[in-house]
Amino acid sequence: GLARFADNSFDTVVMARALQAVKAPDVLLLDMLRVAREAVITFPNFAHWQNRIHLGLKGMMPVSEALPYDWYNTPNIHLCTFKDFEQLCAQHDIHIVNRFAVSDSEKGHTPLMKALIRQAPNLLADVAIYRVTKRKPE
């Protein structure tokens, strides 16, 4: 954990593709913002359309580039979506500075597809990237 670090020890703390694998993601997120002015968090988006189709049609947990494990050997214990994460931030009064929607196969995407991914990230993005801060008193 981050208990050994004093408040405001860092400018930025980064957690890359690990949020879904920690025991208490909400507690860790708050601790990240205790030790740093801002946090950057990335995680696989469980609501991606391919995951939805796989689960809906095959009735099995999806395995993909973003989620490369079978259900029984995955380190992922708290899968979430863009909307889930944004709800968590709202519940804990965390300010979302930036949100980026990324597709692992984005290299071949047209500008139109990239725009669609930004407009419908919960459906079309494989990976979520957020930059967050503590909400400043108004």
Residue ranges of model-derived segments:
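Short, catalytically relevant binding-site loops at active-site mouths
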Residues: 1, 20, 46-48
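Short, flexible segments with low predicted structural confidence
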Residues: 3-4, 11, 57-61
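Alpha-helix C-terminal capping/helix-to-coil transition sites in glycosyltransferase folds
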Residues: 8-9, 35
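A short SAM/SAH-binding and catalytic strip from SAM-dependent methyltransferases
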Residues: 11-24, 43-44
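S-adenosyl-L-methionine-dependent methyltransferase catalytic module, highlighting the catalytic core
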Residues: 27-31, 38-137
